[in-house]
From Swiss-Prot:
<dbReference type="InterPro" id="IPR036179">
    <property type="entry name" value="Ig-like_dom_sf"/>
</dbReference>
<protein>
    <recommendedName>
        <fullName>Protein CD300H</fullName>
    </recommendedName>
</protein>
<keyword id="KW-1133">Transmembrane helix</keyword>
<dbReference type="GO" id="GO:0004888">
    <property type="term" value="F:transmembrane signaling receptor activity"/>
</dbReference>
<feature type="disulfide bond">
    <location>
        <begin position="43"/>
        <end position="111"/>
    </location>
</feature>
<keyword id="KW-1015">Disulfide bond</keyword>
<feature type="topological domain" description="Cytoplasmic">
    <location>
        <begin position="190"/>
        <end position="201"/>
    </location>
</feature>
<feature type="glycosylation site" description="N-linked (GlcNAc...) asparagine">
    <location>
        <position position="100"/>
    </location>
</feature>
<feature type="domain" description="Ig-like V-type">
    <location>
        <begin position="25"/>
        <end position="123"/>
    </location>
</feature>
<dbReference type="InterPro" id="IPR013783">
    <property type="entry name" value="Ig-like_fold"/>
</dbReference>
<dbReference type="Pfam" id="PF07686">
    <property type="entry name" value="V-set"/>
</dbReference>
<comment type="function">
    <text>May play an important role in innate immunity by mediating a signal for the production of a neutrophil chemoattractant.</text>
</comment>
<feature type="transmembrane region" description="Helical">
    <location>
        <begin position="169"/>
        <end position="189"/>
    </location>
</feature>
<comment type="subunit">
    <text>Interacts with TYROBP and HCST.</text>
</comment>
<keyword id="KW-0472">Membrane</keyword>
<dbReference type="InterPro" id="IPR013106">
    <property type="entry name" value="Ig_V-set"/>
</dbReference>
<feature type="topological domain" description="Extracellular">
    <location>
        <begin position="25"/>
        <end position="168"/>
    </location>
</feature>
């Protein structure tokens, strides 16, 4: 086999290594939560990875960034800041919970299994079994976004409460003046002197 033929077969060989790893861990491709709330991602794996460490990290998931949260040994539950990983070997799943979400938590994450090569410090030679999750964070919960019915405006001419307001005090004299004038006019009209018509002699 020539050197050129070997170089041409190298990408195919790497693809064969990657495809099995990409299919051994599964879960949702997209999850959504609201700011201040929590969301959970359930990751399912094959039985052969039952005793392996499980991890959660943000893409591109570089170890030097120290943003990876990983179970270790017999620990079934690991917590780091707002991330909790709970392994359930009985049903071959592990759950990742993100608490107190912020807008900055939105992005792409990796839900994966730590291989032996990675545990031995040989990270990067073989791809870990994992799948990618898109985390979406909404600005507010649906309850906060609900439309509130505006209060009915009060009429300025109405007097509410047991004690009249200052507005009512101002309106009452204005209403009494025309009423008094009407009554006074009626009294004067009734009591006016009647003229006796002149009789012709």
């Amino acid at each position: 086999m020539t050197q050129r033929a070997g170089a041409a077969m190298l990408p195919s060989a790497l693809l064969l290594l990657c495809v099995p790893g990409c299919l051994t861990v599964s879960g949702p491709s997209t999850v959504m939560g609201a700011v201040g709330e929590s969301l959970s991602v359930q990751c399912r794996y094959e039985e052969k990875y039952k005793t392996f460490n499980k991890y959660w990290c943000r893409q591109p998931c570089l170890p030097i960034w120290h943003e990876m949260v990983e179970t270790g040994g017999s620990e079934g539950v690991v917590r780091s800041d707002q991330v909790i990983i709970t392994d359930h070997p009985g049903d071959l799943t592990f759950t990742v919970t993100l608490e107190n979400l912020t807008a900055d938590d939105a992005g792409k994450y990796r839900c994966g299994i730590a291989t032996i090569l990675q545990e031995d410090g040989l990270s990067g030679f073989l791809p870990d079994p994992f799948f990618q999750v898109q985390v979406l964070v909404s600005s507010a919960s649906s309850t906060e976004n609900s439309v509130k019915t505006p209060a009915s405006p009060t009429r300025p001419s109405q007097c509410q409460g047991s004690l009249p307001s200052s507005t009512c005090f101002l309106l009452l004299p204005l209403l009494k003046v025309p009423l008094l004038l009407s009554i006074l006019g009626a009294i004067l009209w009734v009591n006016r002197p009647w003229r006796t018509p002149w009789t012709e002699s």
